[in-house]
C-alpha cells in the first residue's frame, strides 16, 4: 500500500490547484490505482511500489509519500473527515465514492484497493451514524447557514448569496444540504456566480440586478472580498423584512442598517460563537472516531488476510493442475507400450519429483524469512 499526497495543510489552495494530476494520463499509465482529488487535497492510492511517477507528475517532489499501515490509517481518517479542513465534513465521503467508481469503470482497481475503498466508505458512514463528528457548522460559511436556520428556518425560503469566492463557496456547500426553495448567487464576475449557482441548482444574477434579487429573497448572506460596502441603509429602506448575515472581511454591510426595523443584521462576530461551540462538540467526538477507525482497521486486516489465503489457494490449485497435465502428457508419451499400472507409477513419481524440486529450488534461493512470507509456487 502506497499513497502520494499533497493537501491544504502544506500548500495554499491556488498552489494545490496548479499541482492537480492529469487523471487520464495517470490511469493510462498504471494498472491499479485510484485518484482522489478535491479542492483541498490531491491523493493517489496504489497497492504496490512505483518507481517512475515523476514522469507523470512534474511536481512530484512536492508530494508526500506514505506506506503500509500509516497509509491505510491515513485513508480511513480522510474518509471520516478527520483529515479535512472542516473537521468531520460530509462532502469528502461522496468524493471518495466517485473516485472509486471512476477507477472501477476504467478497470483500474485491484482486489486490495477494492477492499480498502469499500472499507473506508463503510467506516465513514459508520462514524457519521454513530457519532456527532459532522453535526453543527464549524466553518464561518456553515455557521452562517446554521444561524439563518435558527432565526428563520430555511425550508421553502429564498436565499441570496452575494459573493462567489472562497467564503461564498463554503456557504454554498452548507446550503446544498438544506431544502431551500430558491438560491440566487450574485457576483461582480458573472461567470463565477453562474458556476456556483449551477452547483447549487440555483440561478445567477448580474450585480446590476442586485436590488431585484434582494426584494425576492428572505435571507441575504454577504461574502465578497470588496474593500467597500455592498449594502448601505439607503439600499434597504423598502425591501420588506430580511435577515442579513455579513461574513465578509472587511464588512459588506454598513452597520447603520441596524437602525432599520425591517432588517435583522448579523456579522462574523455573531457567528464565531456558533462556530466555536460546534467545533468543541466535534472535538469531543474525536476519541470515539479514533476507536472506531482502529477497530475497523483490525477487521480490514483480517479481510485482507482472508483474501490473500483465497488467492494462495487459487494459485496453488492452478500450479498443481498445470504440473499434473504436463507430467501426465509426458508419462503417456514415454510409456506407450507399458501397462496402465506402470504409467500411473511413472506419472506419480514424476509428479511428486517435480513439485518437490520446485519447492527445494526456491527454498535454497531465498532467506528463511522470505520463504515463510512468500508464495513459492508463484515464482
Swiss-Prot record:
GO terms for molecular function: glutamyl-tRNA reductase activity; NADP binding. CDD domains: NAD_bind_Glutamyl_tRNA_reduct (cd05213). Keywords: NADP, Oxidoreductase, Porphyrin biosynthesis. The active site is at 39 (nucleophile). SUPFAM superfamilies: Glutamyl tRNA-reductase catalytic, N-terminal domain, Glutamyl tRNA-reductase dimerization domain, NAD(P)-binding Rossmann-fold domains. Pfam families: GlutR_dimer, GlutR_N, Shikimate_DH. It is an enzyme of class 1 (oxidoreductase). Its EC number is 1.2.1.70. GO terms for biological process: protoporphyrinogen IX biosynthetic process from glutamate. InterPro entries: 4pyrrol_synth_GluRdtase, 4pyrrol_synth_GluRdtase_dimer, 4pyrrol_synth_GluRdtase_N, GluRdtase_CS, GluRdtase_dimer_dom_sf, GluRdtase_N_sf, NAD(P)-bd_dom_sf, Shikm_DH/Glu-tRNA_Rdtase. During catalysis, the active site Cys acts as a nucleophile attacking the alpha-carbonyl group of tRNA-bound glutamate with the formation of a thioester intermediate between enzyme and glutamate, and the concomitant release of tRNA(Glu). The thioester intermediate is finally reduced by direct hydride transfer from NADPH, to form the product GSA. Homodimer. Possesses an unusual extended V-shaped dimeric structure with each monomer consisting of three distinct domains arranged along a curved 'spinal' alpha-helix. The N-terminal catalytic domain specifically recognizes the glutamate moiety of the substrate. The second domain is the NADPH-binding domain, and the third C-terminal domain is responsible for dimerization. This is Glutamyl-tRNA reductase. It comes from Methanococcus vannielii (strain ATCC 35089 / DSM 1224 / JCM 13029 / OCM 148 / SB).
